[in-house]
Amino acid sequence: EYLCLHIENQINAGADTVQIFDSWAGLIPNEILYDHCYIPNKKIVEFCKEKKAPVICFPRGINKKYLEFAKIVKPNCLNLDYRIDPMWAKENLKNFCLQGGMDPNILFKSENEIFKEVDKYLTIFKDTPYIFNLGHGLLPKTNPDTLKKVIDRVNNFR
């Protein structure tokens, strides 16, 4: 209830998309995942859709339960965590817009290795609704220059 009030205030202040980070979803036991992850997320998604705000859900760590989550919760987009195989996601979540997936640790590797991983995601999801992003947050020592190169790579990808 309070979360929806906060989201409504964000929408009224100009937010045009809402992202729900369910950071602990992967730690919820299977027996209670439906009641303690799917249903609360579904209520928030329904509220956002009533307010005409698209919703991206990030149920971190639920692994191959992403499909079940997506079918029940019905977000506009799913943010993949870095443990999800991108080919599995493309094959099994093909009816959904997807975001993310790349391991943030890749950003500490050589430029060639980074670009290889970026290109992998962009190639796999080339013909599907996909938003390039990481599969988790930036790590504290990530070099901003590396991020600029990644952004340039994404923007210039053909």
Annotate each PLM feature.
Residues E1-R158:
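Active-site loop segments of alpha/beta catalytic cores
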